[in-house]
Amino acid sequence: MRDGDILKDKKILIVDDEPDILETLMELIDMCLIDTAPDFETAKKFLSKNTYDAAILDIMGVRGYDLLQITTQKDIPALMLTAHALSPEHLIKSIKEGAHSYVPKDKMVDIETFLSDLILAHEKGLKKHGRWFERLKPFFDKQFGPEWREADKDFWKDFDLKYMVTKEEVGDVI
């Protein structure tokens, strides 16, 4: 199944304080039914009235972590999309607080793929939804340096066990 097929008519909330980002995302996932919010209060109102298949949340400028808390309580899988909060610390915080994905705005052009992975994993009830990380690890290694996971070894060991599918597990499924 193609990413666009997975996303067709999915209800998505996009929250970002940059109008050009909202516009670009709407164009990239135009097969979805989209609500956009430029700030926390607007997003909070949408979340109180509507249900969503997923949310794309900026971190800075829109109180993204507060919105993440709301989406997590409502069982709406959230993809954190960031430029200013692009750091190992924010990546870890996003995961710990319930984000299903953490995507740099530099990789926004691939949002259809990341969002499809997220929604498919959520719909199937998959606990191991780390495909986004597999796709982005080379980017993170380049951005943060090859040893960036060493500072939080225990977190990343736990992350790998919880969210990454091993070769053996893939073999069991096939």
Where are the regions a protein language model picked out?
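Alpha-helical interaction/dimerization surfaces of two-component signaling modules
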Residues: 24-29, 46, 70, 93
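A short, hydrophobic beta-strand element within the central beta-sheet of small alpha/beta folds
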Residues: 56, 60, 68-71, 75-88
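Alpha4 helix (beta4-alpha4-beta5 surface) of REC/receiver domains from two-component response regulators
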Residues: 66, 73, 85-113, 117
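C-terminal output/effector regions of signal-responsive regulators
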Residues: 120-174
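Two-component/phosphorelay signaling modules centered on CheY-like receiver
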Residues: 19-36
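Phosphate-coordination loops involved in phosphoryl transfer and adenosine-cofactor binding
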Residues: 9
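Acidic di-acidic motifs
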Residues: 14-17
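Acidic, metal-coordinating helix/loop segments flanking the phosphotransfer/catalytic sites
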Residues: 19, 36-54, 62
